[in-house]
Amino acid sequence: MRLASTDLASRPPISLSRRRESPSPTSVDVLVPTLKGLSSEFVEHLRNRIPVHCVLTSSAIGPARARQELIGRVDTDWFAFVDDDVKLRPDWWSTVAGMIGPDVGGVEGLWSYLAGDKRVDDYARAMARLSTLLHQESWRDRIDRAFTGDTLVRTKAIKNIRVPDIPVWEDEYIRRWVEKNGYRWLRTPNVVCDHLRTYNLKPSYNVGRYGYYLGKLTVRTQLKRLAQLPIKVLFSLAYTGDIAAATFAIDKDVNIFKGTLQAYVQRNSGSPLYSLAQP
C-alpha cells in the first residue's frame, strides 16, 4: 500500500562525488512492515516526525521478506524503516538526520522499552549501572546487532541487496550490506524512540541460532554470558527490586545459548545458512 504525502573486511574508498553530496534529505519514503495495516493516527504520527514522501507498507510474512519487498519500492535517495510498534520521540528526525555525513549509510535510533515492557527496561538500567561500576562494557545487556525499527538508510548503500528469508537478524544483514558498500552504520547516542510492545522471548532461541550462522555469536561468548548471569540477576534484583526482570534475563540468555549451541553442533552439516556470514 502507498500513502502519498504533501568483501566485509575492507571498504572501498569514498569517492569525490560522494563527498559533494548534500547530507540532509528533504523528504524520504517511510517503510513499515505490518500485518495489520496502519491506523490514521500512526500515519499522522509519522508525518509529524518525518518529512514524508510516501508511506509504504508490506504485509509479507516475515520481517526479512517484508523489508526486501519494501526496499524495492523506494523512490527517494534516503528512506526510513519504522516498525508499527514504535513511537518516535519529537527529536528523532533532527537527531538522526543530524548524524548524516558523506560516508554514512545508515543511522539507527537508540530505543527504549520503558513504555512497553518495564521488566526489560529495569534489567537494561541495572546492567548499565553494573557495567559502570565494574568499568566493563561486556556486562551491559546488549548483543551488538543492528535494529531497523527506527532507522534512516541511504538507498544507494543497499543497492542490489537480497535479504535472506531469516526470522531474526535481518537487521544485521542489512547493516553488513551497508558496510560492505563502504558506508558507516551509526547509532544515536541518546534514546529517540520507544518500543510499545512486550518483549517476545520466543524468538530468542533463533537469536542464538542465526547469530551463530552470521558469525556474531559463539558458544564461548554465550558461555561467558551464562557465567555472568547469577551476578547480573542478583544485582538486578538489588537495584530494581523487579523479580520479573530477573526471570526475563534468565529465560532470554538460556534460550540464546541453546540456539547458539545447536548451531555449533550442526556446523558440519553443510547447512546453506552458513553462507549468511558473507553477504
Listing of model-derived features with the role each one plays in the protein:
Residues 1-48:
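N-proximal low-complexity "stem/linker" segments adjacent to membrane-targeting elements
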Residues 58-74:
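Glycine-rich, basic loop-to-helix element that forms the pyrophosphate-binding segment
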Residues 79:
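Short aromatic/hydrophobic "clamp" motif used to bind/position activated sugar donors
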Residues 91-122:
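Conserved donor NDP-sugar-binding/catalytic core segment of glycosyltransferases
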Residues 125-144:
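Short, flexible, basic/aromatic active-site loop/helix in glycosyltransferases
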Residues 148, 168-176:
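Acidic donor-binding loop at a coil-to-helix junction in glycosyltransferase catalytic cores
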Residues 183-205:
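Active-site donor/metal-binding and catalytic loop motifs
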Residues 203-279:
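Non-catalytic, C-terminal membrane-associated alpha-helical segments of glycosyltransferases
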